[in-house]
Amino acid sequence: MQRDDALRALVASRLAAWQLHAPDAAGLKQAAVVLVVADEGRGAQLRGLRQARGWSTQAALILTRRAKGLSGHAGQWALPGGRIDAGETPEQTALRELQEEVGLQLQPDDVLGRLDTFITRSGYAITPVVVWAGAA
């Protein structure tokens, strides 16, 4: 447990010290993705996730694989995420999309911070949100 607390504290302190770069996103579609950090846990034991085989016992991020039948980015690996709804913050969007896409429901106090918003060629301004899923 101490190692989990130490990793969470380290990630949170680094994010708090990070000077965010906020590009001009006027007129762009706003979106958020979520980077879920799990410390030395098996995915099968993370709160809310079904049992899976072959998970690493090291710190990990959760990725999704887009359906092969989609018109855009079919079959690609992606971070959970999506468009920011009216009145939502990037953090709220990240937690909502995580629950919708992966079935993992985390709480606002699991949010550790943000990374720089980046602009895509397809007209999106995407804000990465880092959250803590804890240990197995």
What do the PLM-derived regions correspond to, one by one?
Residues 1-78, 82-136:
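N-terminal leader/linker segments that precede catalytic domains of diphosphate-processing enzymes
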